[in-house]
Amino acid sequence: MAFAISAMMSCEIETSGNGDLDGFWHLVRVDTLSTGGMCDMSGRRVFWSVQVGILNATDYDRYHKGYLFHFDKTDSSLHIFDPYKDNRTEGDIKIEDPSELYHLGINAIDETFTIEQLEGSRMILATDVLRLSFKKM
């Protein structure tokens, strides 16, 4: 009995501090800022999943395992970096060519997004080139 009580007292609930960012996000729209172009992504299966310090970006129509990133978040920015292609059976593969990430709305190996909106079920991220709109699932 004493062991059970001491074990329970030593447990702490871990929180990420990510707030509304944590969760499963569907990329529903990509705007190209320089041209004013818009791409409706709502019919595509591109998702970003965020938990603690890992972001997993997956295009289920192309490659179902996804890409893993570390990230840093402030109130106004999301910095993603150090991408790896998920390959658990043989070891994750470090991404060196950013073109491998374009279909996910990511244009660089190390990229910082301005958080234009992050509340409830809506997130909008922007760079100098793109604006990404997400819906939380």
Placement of each model-derived feature along the sequence:
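Long, contiguous N-terminal structural blocks used for assembly/anchoring
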Residues: 28-31, 47
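Short, hydrophobic/aromatic-rich segments at coil-to-beta transitions
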Residues: 22-24, 51-56, 118-124
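Edge beta-strand at a domain terminus
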Residues: 70-76, 118-137
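Sec-dependent bacterial lipoprotein signal peptides
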Residues: 1-12
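Short, surface-exposed polybasic-and-hydrophobic patches located at secondary-structure transitions
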Residues: 40-52, 135-137
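Contiguous, well-ordered beta-strand patches that form the walls/edges
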Residues: 31-38, 42, 53-118
